[in-house]
Amino acid sequence: MIKAVRYCLTLLTALLILTTPTNSKVSDSVVYVQEPAPITLSLKPDYFSNITYSNEELECLALNIYFEAGVESTAGKLAVANVTINRKNSSDYPNTICGVVKEGKHYHDKRIDKRYPLRDRCQFSWYCDGLVDKPKKGRTWNTSLEVAEIALKKHYADILIDITDGSTHYHANWMEKYPSWAYTKKKMATIDRHIFYKSGKYR
């Protein structure tokens, strides 16, 4: 019963965070599909007019949300965004969103001067699973972009609420055997299909 109440409170918090007034300035390079979005935003002109972030940051965060929690609720998507941003703020990880998402071993193809992740040698499995990392156009991608955009704006405005309470790690709750690192960190929350853990130093 207590877990159910905590989950409901987490979901309500996520919805409250994502419906706070904001602007929509997603780059023209990102394609939206004209489908009904499950999240309705209340817009307020110039609310975040001084907040800036790059299109690359937006795409990296949206891709991480899409592949890690695309089928989950708004709370599940926001939780992945929180962990990504928490890692960026931690001295234990790269200090950029894309650096965090793409952290891991790479090889350099000198013929075309491009780096590729080594199979199963990265932090987020979708990035190095050998599959094409191209999202399918539709509602799931659109909402992932929307959550990423709002999370970035509120992060840089220092008003983003962290529903994972500082977590830097998570794993699926359906795993029969948890990763070894899970026993060395503090469990902070269970949101949708992931269990979240906290550790590390912060900048």
Say what each PLM segment does.
Residues 6-20:
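Hydrophobic membrane-insertion alpha-helices, especially the h-region
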Residues 2, 25-203:
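Bacterial extracytoplasmic/cell-wall-associated proteins, especially those involved in peptidoglycan
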